[in-house]
Regions:
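C-terminal edge-of-domain segments
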Residues: 2, 125, 129-168
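Polybasic, low-complexity association/targeting segments
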Residues: 1-10
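Short beta-strand segments
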Residues: 33-70
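Residue-level detector of beta-strand face positions
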Residues: 38-40, 89, 138
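Short secondary-structure boundary/capping segments
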Residues: 28-29, 55, 80
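Short, structured beta-strand-loop surface elements
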Residues: 68-123, 129-133, 141-143
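Short, basic/aromatic recognition patches
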Residues: 12-34
């Protein structure tokens, strides 16, 4: 995350974020013995980058953003930022992934909600505490287009089909 983002005014969130930034990794930064990841969003009104540490909910290289705000009646401020600017990045350990956040509905939301509650059981209590349906986003990774030099370097002689796909 090359561009410096704004820290949260909330003390515990700011402390978690500062620890991650100082260490250069999310490894070892936890809430209730559960790992967290660090999302970077863009402010809906300010356009400034914002850090959002959230519980780690991951499946097959995709990450969920659960807008629980501890079961508060209102969505967290980052929810509105992501709705306005869905280009988001996530740091997991020392790896950073960029993608597009998409709010989930129906069966897909139910699936990711199950994963979220398994990763951090208090989410279930938060949902009981509020009248709003807690939103869940999934971060869809950006496609990675390999340069021919990278493919040749990483993979000895791609087959004809792969070579054709790479040229297209």
């Amino acid at each position: 995350m090359s561009e410096q983002a704004e820290l949260s005014p909330t003390e515990w969130v700011r402390e978690q974020t500062q620890k991650i930034l100082e260490q250069g990794t999310t490894d070892g930064v936890e809430v209730m013995d559960r790992p967290i990841v660090l999302f970077t969003t863009t402010g809906a009104q300010s356009g400034k980058k914002r850090y959002v540490p959230l519980m780690r909910v991951e499946e097959n290289g995709r990450y969920a953003m659960v807008a629980s705000k501890g079961g508060d009646p209102k969505h967290p401020s980052w929810y509105h930022n992501v709705k306005a600017n869905p280009s988001v990045s996530v740091q997991d350990g020392d790896k950073v992934l960029e993608g597009t956040a998409r709010e989930l509905e129906g069966d897909e939301r139910a699936h990711w909600w199950e994963l979220a509650v398994a990763a951090y059981p208090p989410y279930a209590e938060y949902q009981e505490k509020t009248d709003r349906l807690i939103p869940v986003f999934v971060l869809e990774p950006k496609r990675r287009y390999w340069l021919k030099g990278e493919v040749d370097f990483q993979h000895p002689a791609p087959d004809a089909f792969t070579a054709q796909v790479l040229r297209e």
